[in-house]
Amino acid sequence: MGGKWSKSSVIGWPTVRERMRRAEPAADRVGAASRDLEKHGAITSSNTAATNAACAWLEAQEEEEVGFPVTPQVPLRPMTYKAAVDLSHFLKEKGGLEGLIHSQRRQDILDLWIYHTQGYFPDWQNYTPGPGVRYPLTFGWCYKLVPVEPDKIEEANKGENTSLLHPVSLHGMDDPEREVLEWRFDSRLAFHHVARELHPEYFKNC
């Protein structure tokens, strides 16, 4: 697996992976802007920064130093099932996401990198609510968010060199359930849409 991901896409991934590590605190269920892209080939006036949270977030990134241009260097498009599966396997092969403590900032960096290098609008990486394991709403994305065992959190916070701003030290402040979560690869998610089974209400209009 991999296709186009295995060649040109490797450029920049080690740098982005390191940034995620250091960061401080039209598949099913993509957002409205991605559905626009799928249907019209462009984001329509019904999805603007004033009416769409993902569009507003992207606009705000232009004000920040994110380390790479916010405007994608490839055509804008919605995330598809095949692209989500390929991306999952690419990241598994290259390493860096498996077992990484999740934070919103790290997810933002990943979303922006994918948006910039592949043109996938960043409204697809959403998960089921907690507590417990959070499953991806986008079918084909093979990373779930798994709560970290309390003893592992305690071990990670020992010693004088612990950064108070590292996501593991924030004790889940990013999370509504106050759980510390990590990305975990699960190849079964390419074939079994767990989120749809657990939360069919999220898929009524898909």
UniProtKB/Swiss-Prot annotation:
Any one Gene Ontology BP term: symbiont-mediated suppression of host antigen processing and presentation of peptide antigen via MHC class II
Outcome after substituting P72A: Complete loss of Nef-induced MHC-I down-regulation, MHC-I is not internalized
Keyword Ribosomal protein (UniProt): no
Marked site positions, Cleavage: W57, L58
Phosphoserine, modified sites: S6
Motif segment (Diacidic): 174-175
UniProt keyword terms in alphabetical order: AIDS, Apoptosis, Early protein, Host cell membrane, Host Golgi apparatus, Host membrane, Host-virus interaction, Inhibition of host adaptive immune response by virus, Inhibition of host autophagy by virus, Inhibition of host MHC class I molecule presentation by virus, Inhibition of host MHC class II molecule presentation by virus, Lipoprotein, Membrane, Myristate, Phosphoprotein, Secreted, SH3-binding, Viral immunoevasion, Virion, Virulence
Sequence motif PxxP, residues: 72-75
Chief localisation class: host cell
Residues covered by region (Mediates dimerization, Nef-PTE1 interaction): 108-124
Motif (Dileucine internalization motif): 164-165
Region span, Acidic: 62-65
GO CC annotation: extracellular region; host cell Golgi membrane; host cell plasma membrane; membrane; virion component
Record site feature (Might play a role in AP-1 recruitment to the Nef-MHC-I complex), residues: M20
Processing and modification events after translation: Phosphorylated on serine residues, probably by host PKCdelta and theta. Myristoylated.
Induction: Expressed early in the viral replication cycle.
Domain topic, free-text comment: The dileucine internalization motif and a diacidic motif seem to be required for binding to AP-2.
Subunit organization: Monomer; cytosolic form. Homodimer; membrane bound form. Interacts with Nef associated p21-activated kinase (PAK2); this interaction activates PAK2. Associates with the Nef-MHC-I-AP1 complex; this complex is required for MHC-I internalization. Interacts (via C-terminus) with host PI3-kinase. Interacts with host PACS1; this interaction seems to be weak. Interacts with host PACS2. Interacts with host LCK and MAPK3; these interactions inhibit the kinase activity of the latter. Interacts with host ATP6V1H; this interaction may play a role in CD4 endocytosis.
Family of this protein: Belongs to the lentivirus primate group Nef protein family.
The protein's name in its UniProt record: Protein Nef
Organism: Human immunodeficiency virus type 1 group M subtype B (isolate HXB2) (HIV-1)
Gene responsible for this protein: nef
